[in-house]
Amino acid sequence: MAERSGKITAGQAYIEVEYDYEYDAKDRKIVIRQGERYLLVKKTNDDWWQVRPDENSKAFYVPAQYVKEVTRKALMPPVKQATGLPNNSMKTIQSMHLQRSTENVNKMPELSSFGKPSSSVQGTGLIRDANQNFGSNYNSGQTLNLSLDLTHNNGKFNSDSHSPKVSSQNRTRLFGHFPGPEFLDIEKTSFSQEQSCDSAGEGSERIQQDSESGDELSSSSTEQMRATTPPNQGRPDSPVYANLQELKISQSALPPLPGSPAIQVNGEWETHKDSSGRCYYYNRTTQERTWKPPRWARDVSTSRDFQSPGEQEPLSSEENYHSSCFSQSDSQCGSPPRGWSEELDERGHTLYTSDYTKEKWLKHVDDQGRQYYYSADGSRSEWELPKYNASSQQQREIIKSRSLDRRLQEPIVLTKWRHSTIVLDSNDKDSPTTTKLCLPENESPPTSSKHQDPGQEKYGLLNVTKITENGKKVRKNWLSSWAVLQGSSLLFTKTQGSSTSWFGSNQSKPEFTVDLKGAVIEMASKDKSSKKNVFELKTRQGTELLIQSDNDAVINDWFKVLSSTINNQVAEADEAAEEETPDSPGVEKHDKEKDQKELKKLRSMKGSSMDSSEQKKTKKNLKKFLTRRPTLQAVREKGYIKDQVFGSNLANLCQRENGTVPKFVKLCIEHVEEHGLDVDGIYRVSGNLAVIQKLRFAVNHDEKLDLNDSKWEDIHVITGALKMFFRELPEPLFTFNHFNDFVNAIKQEPRQRVTAVKDLIRQLPKPNQDTMQILFRHLKRVIENGEKNRMTYQSIAIVFGPTLLKPERETGNIAVHTVYQNQIVELILLELSTVFGR
């Protein structure tokens, strides 16, 4: 998180946190604290603002009501005055040197530590001038030499001779480009101290600040404090430093030398138990012993992955060892420790699963607010998660495979707002100067500004149901879902309640995602849903959705936005398809086989780790496969896939069949006139919907259709399929643009109605006129046999009125429109010879 003080970049807008807030993102927890400051990126809406800690970090969202926008003047850090040290607070420290190694150190902002200036000095701590800001033009190959001498001079601090000194010729770039605090890039630091101690012997001990507990001494291979005890001097019960009051040097606190085989080995460190059963750690190379788990060094190549291309310089083994050490408690920084995966169990507790042994541990907090871990079976409890001996190569493979799996399963990640690589534990009260370095375990920083998450384009509450999933029909189940259009993907999650946007809600993971690439969108027919304002979305993967809203304006807006998004995706895909799509239909089969091979290969790779070369090869093949694969519309335009009969445009269908009346319409009419004119309730009685769907499927797939087959012996199945054909037309037989004209015509005087309707029919396209003529002549013959089938002009008009004539957008006048629709059909049937001639 951001610091509460530090240098401010000129010309930028900043916000300051007024209240604490936290929420769960996809794979981490976003936490902001009162007083923290961030760089304002964008005021997304009234509820959420987009911010980031610095210009090089990933942006994330904060609630606008919890922050305030501040000016540069308000953000400038105050000038701190040096405070005198009391006589009894600190003994004379002869010399204290903070010396930077003269070796050439690589500049790595991701591995920087926070320099955390103390707000006040109350007799303890090392004093630092708040105005001591270093320039940004330091050479990373030069040496920083800081000398800080604190003398016990009558209780006063000698600022003239003992203030920090920085050589103008030996400076190093210490601070990253962050808008908040300054960042001290300390990769290898050693403290040397000469002072009085309790013990009379001579020797050296290694101590380390422990931010979690002050009751035990700990040592680390990355930060070492050496305390030399001169003879004939003593300081009973006095702290080593004034700001390290809890740490005391005690020769007897060291663990014993190992006398039995190691319980566990991790690199150079071995885990042993003493006679009381307490675990301690022993380094075979340096012979260090410590009660606290050491910080493991990260692999050189892994550390370099976090550098930008322009900053990659070779590190010496020692420098890399010291600059790449991490605390095991990585989960406190927002991500689980390396080698562990994090999830929530059914009770909402944080559950960690080992990537090596599949062992499960739970995280808990004791009554003092300290975090600890216990195994799922309750047999063990530790302050830190167990560490397992895994080679750096295996760790990289697990990291890479996990990252690949996540991208494949969840193509759009909305809540992963930032790639935070450095987190300062601001709640660490025991050790104000302790810093923690946290790097993401399964991702690398973006190499350019182009890799930003796409912005939110549209969101809102919609009713949605799936009718087909992966080519298989599913039961319709309408749900009220929160929809978010993000780039080329449409995401659905549960209702957000009072939240007005996707961001910041606890429901950060979408229920399902729809890929709009190659999708088809159209208004749904009545047989798909009886609801109003429904449109159908068909994806390239074989999923069909019905999306609905009671608000006409909302559904029309969504329809336009989704149509525009789909058209943009089709245009981009067609450009690639024109260059690389094969011209021969025979290659389509080869492409399908190749697709299946690629998918099988992809599934096998998900379960196993891959080395770097294999992963690069797979990414390249997958990218090539996705870019070369043509969209459904492009293949259909080339003639490889024929359009279906049901749901096709009438003019296109007639053009494809080289006629003006669809063949299926002729076939149904001939069959009904031959076998069904005397059937009671013909066209009014509904047929078996399942059999009708089978007939529809057979027609759409160009199967040889014989209506005299026993499968179609029910005449109501034939009439039901004919009515379904006209219902599923994208534009009804009486086209949308003439609907109001037909309604106005039927409102005229009886003598003028026929002429007006006749003139309007002549304005329709030729396929519409011819199909209308053959259909109405057939219905006239059905009515003429009314003594047998009991069908009248009114009953036929009621059946076919809403099917053949309907407005483009349903309004509140459905009942009135239904009356007009029936009257128009009835008028044409009564005046058939006048309208169409004999």
From Swiss-Prot:
Residues 263-296, 355-388 form the WW domain. GO terms for molecular function: GTPase activator activity. Residues 155-172, 189-198, 303-334 have a biased composition (Polar residues). The modification Phosphothreonine is found at residues 228-229. Keywords: GTPase activation, Phosphoprotein, Repeat, SH3 domain. GO terms for cellular component: phagocytic cup. Residues 155-239, 291-346, 425-456, 572-620 are annotated as: Disordered. This is Rho GTPase-activating protein 12. The lineage of its organism: Eukaryota, Metazoa, Chordata, Craniata, Vertebrata. The gene is Arhgap12.
